[in-house]
A protein has these predicted regions:
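Non-core capping and flanking segments associated with repeat-based/extracellular domains
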Residues: 1-311
Length: 311
């Protein structure tokens, strides 16, 4: 019976210091759990061949130590706005990471020595000025830890916070990413971060932009923060060469897609493929209306697509 168990789903309060013996378990999902550090350690010790772990809205957990889980390769963590995730993660054997950061109590320390692929996003609905400053520090430290990751996916809220850091001229780490995916609407509030990410990814081969409504931070919150820092928002959101983009994501026009493609081509040297994949609600124009730019010294494949499966 135990040998046939490959996956367990549970939504409960896990008693402190629970003892389990799931010696054949390879995939574990824990959702809506009040999970202490001691309980998590006990569960992990009873799952010696665990390969995949998902923590979905697990409160109380502060330190997630996976250093003794030698077989663990995939880790997914999803907190919620009022249920923070762990603030310390030790996952030296994990190769694939999905991490959604809680805006109020984000993970500030993590070891992911052998990580090959990461997907990062921020769970936030209302941004205040204190969180804006705190999150900039958090996301930049995370990127620094992920310098050797070759496949990276960033969500719209994550890009917003990176844009604030770029406008303020905060240094960005260099990345070794070869395959970069951005899940965001195309509008002015993500342009500074996209431009800097491209410039700091000299080995980039493939860029995918999944145009979808995942940007939940309000534009006025971003503008208000910059004004308090002494910046003029109307001047901050342009690209380095002065190109202006749409202020509202749903008001995207063909020229804005063209401008984005031009920005990508100007800021990359090794890129082979660009794919811009639109959610079925965006855009309001036909993709044939987009003028696809070309550069004589670059041979880059550019594809504009609809309704691809979102992994």
């Amino acid at each position: 019976m135990e040998a046939r168990i490959h996956q367990i789903y549970t939504m409960m309060v896990i008693p402190r210091c629970s003892v389990v013996s799931w010696t054949s378990l390879k995939k574990l999902y824990l959702g809506d759990c009040a999970l202490s550090d001691e309980s998590m350690a006990a569960i992990l010790s009873g799952c010696p061949v665990l390969e995949c772990l998902t923590l979905d809205t697990c409160g109380e957990l502060k330190v997630l130590d996976l250093s003794k889980s030698l077989c663990l390769r995939t880790l997914d963590i999803y907190p919620y706005s009022w249920v923070p995730g762990p603030t310390q993660i030790l996952a030296p054997h994990v190769h694939n990471l999905i991490l959604v950061i809680n805006s109020q109590l984000a993970c500030t320390s993590f070891d992911v020595s052998y990580l090959a692929e990461a997907r990062l996003e921020i769970c936030i609905f209302v941004l205040n000025n204190v969180e804006a400053g705190f999150l900039q520090d958090v996301v930049l430290k995370m990127l620094e830890k992920l310098q050797n990751v070759e496949k990276l996916t960033l969500g719209g809220n994550f890009l917003h916070i990176l844009s604030l850091a770029e406008v303020r001229s905060v240094p960005f780490p260099k990345l070794k990413v070869k395959d970069l995916t951005l899940k965001t609407l195309i509008f002015q509030y993500v342009i500074p971060s996209i431009e800097r990410l491209l410039q700091n990814s000299p080995d980039l081969k493939k860029l995918t932009v999944r145009v979808k409504s995942s940007n939940y931070i309000r534009d006025y919150a971003l503008d208000d923060y910059l004004e308090l820092q002494g910046f003029n928002p109307d001047q901050c959101w342009r690209s380095k060469d002065g190109v202006s983009f749409n202020k509202v994501g749903c008001s995207i026009e063909p020229k804005h897609v063209t401008s984005l493609l031009e920005l990508v081509l100007k800021n990359t040297k090794t890129l082979d493929n660009i794919a811009v994949i639109f959610d079925e609600r965006y855009p309001s124009f036909k993709l044939e209306e987009v003028v696809v730019p070309t550069l004589s010294h670059k041979n880059v494949s550019i594809a504009l697509l609809y309704n691809q499966t979102d992994p």
